Amino acid sequence: MATYTCITCRVAFKDADIQRAHYKTDWHRYNLKRKVADMPPVTAENFQERVLAQRAVAEERDKVTATYCTVCSKRFSTFNAYENHLKSKKHLELEKKAVQAVSKKVKILNEKNLEKGLAVESVDKDEMNAAIQQAIRAQPSSSPKKVPLPPSHASSSPVPMESAGLLQSKERTQKPPRLQWFEQQAKKLAKQEAEEEEDSEEGWEEMDSDEDLGSEEEMEGVEEEEEKQAEAESTCAIGAIPVTDCLFCSHHSRTLMKNVAHMTKVHSFFIPDIEYLVDLRGLIKYLGEKIGVGKICIWCNEKGKSFYSTEAVQAHMNDKSHCKLFTDGDAALEFADFYDFRSSYPDHKEGQDMEVPAELPSDRELEYDDDTMELIPPFRCKSWSSFFNEILQAAVWSVKNGGCY
């Protein structure tokens, strides 16, 4: 009596090796699926009949699919019609002409090779013709291949300007805005370095005491050029976020101070080493260009993913709590132009970090703080640390009293 059986297929085996081999067959897997579906198993003969029937259906489906003759440029709905077309007189004539055309091209290429000194291997003409005929013979395909238009048609039907513009815009969008912005910054740095080298090479020119510095018209022209240059530097780049707009949302403030207060309170925006910051406007303007033009997160920088809209960058920074500057290691050098750390040096002496004019202009009034009555000299701004302390105190007071700041 056989002791090795398969309960799923309801069969018995003589030894364990045949039983293990049975577990790997498609018949056993098929019966397992039927068992899961609460269906009775099938015998081995019935399974083979099902497999053959499925193969016949697949072959019939392949024959029914649409076929295309590349020589005659015709499509046929059934495989039988396609086979009858291959035996037709018209198709055979076109195929013969195609073979002659290809043979002519091969002959021309062989003549050119002989002129260049390249030896042509001796090949039987019958074999060559058979190979050419087999190569160009129409093969069944599901869909016809698109044939490119000849140059005459291409020139007679020019591409519309709108489609050309779309193609150009697609080519532009292939390069991420972040990469474009980094390239612009690299060009600016290279230009600044080149200008500094030119200035150092030119040096100072000695002038005689008798020579004049120039007429008044020349001085006015120089002043106008300086004013134009200052205006050009003050204007924001295309797409940059203005200094009065929030870097992380669509909020607009009347002044830069109110904008910084909004970002500090709502988005927990934090500027490191605020006591050494000397150019707040320049820093906010730079961050506005970085987010608006470069579409870059100020915390992820080049390590994060690429964004293609300002709204996407702002949403990312708000969702990930990246409303802060990344200043670890060498990353702090990015903002070095907006800070002045000379007051933190051990050998620093008061008054060395700025040039105090000998006499103040008589037409300039001194400013003072309304709360502390502290004088604010015209050549020095109020401490940013005290400014942020006032913002935080006002925010705490508004939270305690349930009001809005």
UniProtKB/Swiss-Prot annotation:
Gene3D superfamilies, alphabetized: Classic Zinc Finger
One Gene Ontology molecular-function label: nucleic acid binding
Region (Disordered), start-end ranges: 135-230
First and last residues of each zinc finger (U1-type): 4-28, 67-91
Annotated disulfide bonds: none
GO cellular component: cytoplasm; nucleus; preribosome, large subunit precursor
Any single GO BP term: ribosomal large subunit biogenesis
Keyword field: Cytoplasm, Metal-binding, Nucleus, Repeat, Ribosome biogenesis, Zinc, Zinc-finger
Superkingdom assignment: Eukaryota
InterPro entries reported for this sequence: Matrin/U1-like-C_Znf_C2H2, ZN622/Rei1/Reh1_Znf-C2H2, Znf622/Rei1/Reh1, Znf_C2H2_jaz, Znf_C2H2_sf, Znf_C2H2_type
Protein role: Pre-60S-associated cytoplasmic factor involved in the cytoplasmic maturation of the 60S subunit.
Listed PANTHER family: CYTOPLASMIC 60S SUBUNIT BIOGENESIS FACTOR ZNF622, ZINC FINGER PROTEIN 622
Family membership: Belongs to the REI1 family.
Protein name per its UniProtKB record: Cytoplasmic 60S subunit biogenesis factor ZNF622
Gene that encodes it: ZNF622
